[in-house]
């Protein structure tokens, strides 16, 4: 919002006085608005509304769009006569709230995965780790489960389990998705990471998971999910896009040694944290 909040509230009051409708009611009534624009305007209106403080709190986690829509109608005092005969206001409000609820549900699922630690005694975890190896190095067989050969994939020690402490099983899931669904890109990046100006593929991938998590509430990240769907698959797709973009960015800097890695990584983080078209930003 480009103007001070108090000026915005004065503006809303004057418009409400002349139209007899609240801001959200006007947004929902405007049939010329695109769905994403309506969603963004309603989200902003809720954020800056003194009356909807509890609604804002409810919308910080997964919620029932229909229930929240009814509460907004009651709190904001929508014109009940118009509401009774108008078939677009309430449906438009509910449809704008649905993507927000789905996004919060996705965040909950992601956080749940992040909190699951890698367990060497969990057969599913061990099988997933083997799947990662096979996806990236299908023609290479390791000498043992605990081996320095894991360093080829960019893990720090003989047991990759220790590298997943911060991101849990989510970090492994992201690496597997990228390595299986974008195998050509993943193998090319692995090759790049083992070149003269190398960086650890797996550790970098886990850092990319942390980066996407840290930025997920940025407006342009949220818009990505609102457009494409708030699913784990789309989270994995975004992760893959960020990883590919990072490698291109890193290679374009032509680093002379691995000592430049952290500086380049910070530059990249600054770049994608900007409020802009995320997909276009990553493809440039």
Swiss-Prot record:
This is ELMO domain-containing protein B. GO terms for molecular function: GTPase activator activity. Residues 124-276 form the ELMO domain. InterPro entries: ELMO_dom, ELMO_domain-containing. It comes from the Eukaryota. Pfam families: ELMO_CED12 (PF04727).
């Amino acid at each position: 919002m480009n103007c001070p909040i108090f000026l915005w509230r004065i503006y809303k009051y004057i418009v409400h006085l002349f139209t007899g409708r609240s801001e959200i009611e006007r947004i929902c009534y405007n049939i010329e608005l695109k769905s994403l624009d309506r969603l963004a305007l309603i989200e902003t209106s809720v954020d800056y509304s003194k009356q909807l403080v509890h609604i804002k709190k409810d919308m910080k986690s997964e919620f029932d769009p229909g229930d929240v829509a009814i509460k907004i109608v009651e709190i904001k005092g929508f014109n009940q006569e118009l509401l009774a005969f108008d078939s677009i206001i309430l449906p438009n409000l509910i449809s704008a709230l649905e993507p927000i609820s789905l996004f919060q549900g996705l965040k909950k699922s992601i956080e749940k995965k992040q909190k699951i630690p890698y367990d060497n005694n969990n057969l599913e975890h061990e099988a997933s780790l083997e799947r990662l190896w096979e996806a990236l190095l299908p023609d290479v067989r390791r000498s043992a489960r605990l081996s320095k050969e894991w360093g080829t994939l960019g893990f720090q020690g003989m047991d990759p389990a220790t590298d997943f402490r911060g991101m849990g099983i989510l970090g492994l899931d992201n690496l597997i998705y990228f390595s299986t669904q974008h195998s050509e890109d993943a193998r090319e990046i692995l090759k790049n990471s083992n070149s003269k100006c190398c960086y650890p593929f797996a550790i970098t991938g886990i850092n990319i998971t942390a980066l996407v998590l840290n930025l997920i509430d940025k407006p342009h990240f949220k818009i990505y999910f609102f457009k494409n769907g708030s699913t784990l698959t789309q989270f994995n797709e975004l992760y893959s896009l960020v990883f590919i973009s990072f490698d291109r960015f890193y290679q374009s800097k032509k680093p002379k040694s691995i000592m430049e890695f952290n500086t380049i990584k910070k530059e990249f983080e600054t770049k994608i944290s900007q409020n802009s078209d995320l997909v276009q930003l990553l493809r440039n």
